[in-house]
Amino acid sequence: MTSMEARLGEATRTVPLPAPWDLNAYLAAVAAHRGRSISLRPVSAAMLAEDGCRGKGLWVARGHDDIIVYDADATDRNAEHIILHEVGHMLLGHGKDLAEPATPLSPKLAALLPSLAAQHVLGRNEFGVEGEQEAEVFADMTMVYATLPRRTARGFRLFRRDR
């Protein structure tokens, strides 16, 4: 088993997928596990790009909660994937040390979300290639396993190797 497989397996065992699949229930479980609420904020792709986001979403970490900002024009399925990608970063421990200085929001995003006292704005540039690959595989596999029939909630086994 590779290091990535082990990390992904641990992340999904930590917060099992709800059955039947429900993104809001999963986000609530992730929030409970982390002790930090998670809220979702759709914004224009232009605002995301202004913050240096080459993808379609960012994770805004505040002192006691997290906000996932995503492309408002994304289809439902694509928005879910973007959200799960950011959750992957959270569960895989990709975030910065919250004691480090905050990364500022762009002026437009800060104006749209004035109540955000961001500790960190975490976009694709923050995680490196390996972190981005892990989060992408996490989102892909979560979406696959979320659609599989099953009797109980569970995490996924990457490529079924750890049977």
Each model region followed by its residue ranges:
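Short, well-structured alpha-helical patches and their helix-loop capping segments
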Residues: 75, 79, 83, 127-134
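Short, glycine/charged-enriched secondary-structure capping and boundary segments
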Residues: 83-84, 97
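Active-site scaffold of zinc-dependent metalloenzymes
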Residues: 39-80, 87-93
